[in-house]
Each structure stands twice: as C-alpha cells, then as structure tokens.
Amino acid sequence: MYLIRDIMYCKPGKVRPLLEKFKAMAKLGEKMGWGKMRLMTDVSAERFWTLVTEFEVPDLKTFEEMDQMQGTPEDMKEMERLMTGYHDLVDDGKREIYRLEL
C-alpha cells in the first residue's frame, strides 16, 4: 500500500478557494473510483498557505491509472471545470510517495 501526498503552497489568501476546488474534486474522484482523499490545511507548516492532499493506493500502477484521469465524458468535463484557474492559486508544490509499512 502506498500513500500519495501532494503539497501545494498557495499564493497569499488563496488556500480557501483551492480547498473548495479540491473538496469538489475529492467528491468527483470518489465517484470515479479514486477512493477517499484527505484534505489538510496548515496550522503550522514549512510555509504559510499550505494545502495537503493525501490518498492511499494499493500499488503504483493504480496511481498511474488515476493520474490519467479517465472517466465518463461528463465527469471529465466537470474535472476540467474544477481545475480551471488552479495555477492562479498555487505558487509551488511537490509530491511525496510513501510505502505504508504497517
């Protein structure tokens, strides 16, 4: 089992709009079979205005398939709508992948 963590450093004051996008995306992703996503905002972190998403996958192949974003045409249209303006909210980011040992 693997833990996928995306860490996004938002532009000042842009965490809330990005969080709303990701809440909707998490709901859509669950419908598309991605499983449950956790969303976290910083109380105290490496940088201010941080949003972290986490989800678990059984193997990296599953993650690669999820990353291809395949779904119904309606779902894909909705995902595209949700991602519009994403880059206007984010300054920088990174992805961490961990193997769950216990």
Tell where the protein language model's regions lie, with residue ranges.
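Short coil/turn motifs at secondary-structure junctions
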Residues: 11-13, 44, 58-60
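A short beta-turn/loop motif at secondary-structure boundaries
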Residues: 41-47, 86-87
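An amphipathic, aromatic/His-enriched active-site/gating alpha helix that lines ligand/cofactor pockets
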Residues: 24-38, 54-94
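Short, surface-exposed ligand-recognition loops at beta-strand->loop->(often short) alpha-helix junctions
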Residues: 9-20
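Absolute protein N-terminus
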Residues: 1-2, 102
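Long, low-complexity, Ser/Thr/Gly/Pro-rich intrinsically disordered segments that act as flexible linkers
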Residues: 96-101
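Residue-level preference for beta-strand/loop junctions
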Residues: 2, 47-49
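Active-site-flanking beta-strand signature of metal-NTP-handling nucleotidyl enzymes
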Residues: 3-8
